[in-house]
């Protein structure tokens, strides 16, 4: 189901944008951990890489995203399609974390059977208000397929993460973004848990400070971020730099 959906979106984007110019982009970030929606996915020295192909005057992107750490206990490889326009952005990301020691199926990359697969398809719709004085970001993400199952592995739970973010400060190359997110399951399947926590509620709050550091003729985007999860009573600090931006 996931591969069919991704293929359909890719074909649709291609048919709409065949005559437009295309661009290849490569980024690589160095960070002390990987934080995602209230969770610390991995810690240690990490490299997170994004290789993408953008076409249709910037309205469509096909990409590969990967992450690993120096300890060798975190390995992730995803592919995605993104469509954007008029302030909206839709992204379908097929996520596969095959880190050693995982409690799910981390050995069969091409297994797309709902009750066996170790991957999940996360679909996100973002909207950024276009008014310069009110650049609020609103986001809705639902896991449509994969390892977001009921305890008896008979139903998909469609865990959903909703998020709002606002740039509270922007001056002299500095930017400060504040955000908050909550999670719940569209199909509770008789359970309280969802993909992000033990029950519905706020699982993510963050404050991120970014700066474009000038080193000679080079610009290195750097950031520091605090993230708090009130449900799990955990907090994390992240610092990172984008070493490659092509």
Q: Could you describe each region identified by the protein language model?
A:
Residues 19-23, 56-61, 91, 130-136, ...:
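Short loop/turn motifs that connect adjacent beta-strands in outer-membrane beta-barrel proteins
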Residues 175-215, 221-223:
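Outer membrane beta-barrel transmembrane domains
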Residues 1-25:
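Cleavable N-terminal export/targeting peptides
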Residues 32, 53-55, 83-85, 94, ...:
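Residue-level signature of outer-membrane beta-barrel architecture
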Residues 28-34, 59-70, 90-98, 105-109, ...:
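Transmembrane beta-strand segments that form the barrel wall of outer-membrane beta-barrel proteins
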Residues 207, 233-246:
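Outer-membrane beta-barrel "beta-signal"
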Residues 22-54:
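Outer-membrane beta-barrel initiation region
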Residues 70-163, 189-200:
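Outer-membrane pore/translocation modules
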